[in-house]
Amino acid sequence: MASLALSWSSTATGLPSQPLFSIKPPHSSTYTTRTRRCTWSCKANNGGQNEKHSPQNVETSQGKLDRRNLLLGMGGLYGAAANLVSDRSPALATPITSPDLSKCSTGTNLNTQQPLDVNCCPPVSKEIIDYKLPPVGKMRFRPAAHLAGEDYYAKFEKAVELMKALPPEDPRNFMQQANVHCAYCNLTYQQTGDPKLKLQIHNCWHFFPWHRWYLYFFERILGKLIDDPTFGLPFWNWDNPDGMIMPEVFARKHSPLFDARRNTSHLPPALADLAYSSKSPTNPKKIIPNNLTVMYGEMVRNVSKLEDFYGAKYVVGTAPDPGPGSVERGSHMALHGWVGENTPTGEDMGNFYSTARDPIFYSHHTNVDRLWTVWRGLRGPKPKDFPDSDWLDADFLFYDENAQLVRVKVVDTLDNEKMGYVYQDVDLPWLKNRPLARVKKSKAASSSGAPAAETVFPVKLNKVVKVLVKRPKKSRSKKDKEKEEELLVIEGIEVDTAKFVKFDVFVNDEDDKPDELDKAEYAGCYSQVPHKNSTKVKTKIRLG
């Protein structure tokens, strides 16, 4: 059962229009359902990156309604809203710094109050070296997985086989490498500087840089094991119809790239579903256009501001999961759930503690990393990185290819070529795939009969819910649009981290077909794969 509560404040003026927002019933699923509480807080800003909600401009009363229209649901959520973002990080911020590995814990299952049955803590080393990127000689080349040949895969398989054969206590061993993700992503570390809070690198602005470092060292370990300093990981090119099928080599049962804990219905020749849920379509004629619409939204439509793409600010004193970026909450999460077993906990790929045990994790995330590089290229003269030292100076710990514990910083991840690797050039079929509106907005709103949002929320999402929320201003000029972007921010999404969560968001839709995403009315989604550590978190998403 899902529940939502809304809260608004507004500083904008003008005659409102009334877009329609409707909430559709939850998808039936083998995943356990959960309760979620969402607070919608919206405020127009002036295009700045550091907009904050001060006590005087955040209204927590259920009765105060910001001037915008909204439609929300477990199976579909519709919204049109003015721009605004909440920044709940401490006023005097300190960047996230390396955890104390000696204080790694196995964590506690908050449902049972019993210790977790998985220990993903790494070996502890007394010596930590500040890592410096080595001079780049010949670039490592990362090929598209569906285009790589048998000679390449023979080399890749040999490297993974050797990694799995390393002594269990060696930090370069395959399971030790998998546990790196488990430890950083399942609340086993304390925040250095605020031991009351746990460290989590997902659902925040560290998602891309942390995973880039993770892949960087994993790749270098493989290269050293086969004595090939130019070896590069393959990327699963799931954003292109030609690469949407799981690369066949990963499905060979006797390959070191195989993992038994996968959804057997999604092995080749099934097409990857970038908006995966239990009600997802199986017809390729629907999956492919849906996927291209998802990618356009994540890479073009919903990423005008840096936070939209990277995720929310996360510093010492910030509670975990302040908010994911567009790719992280969308296609990235969808593929984790799509590959993992069809069980409530979704191992291996579909659960954060076990996901990196599946070798396809690394090809999946190599494509995510590639999309970061692509997005930066699409930005042109626009800012590509936060100038904030709280982001640039954040640091993490990894073991390198020599089993040396090293400290690395976000600032060194901003150029993949300086890190010594490049990607194979492939087409971007989603780039020109801007979806068209199916209905006139005025028609959708006027014919809906939906009540005002303040009369409906809070609500349990066990049925279709449609509400109208007034926008702050209509008929904005081009100059107005350049000055203020219109966004829907859903914040205060409260979830249990141990369970699968997904809802879609639509604006002014009228046909109640949540499996049809190739239309402008589809605004995006929120998605979460389970964690081993069960806890309640609050997060947010931003939709354009």
Feature locations, PLM:
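C-terminal accessory segments of proteins
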Residues: 2-544
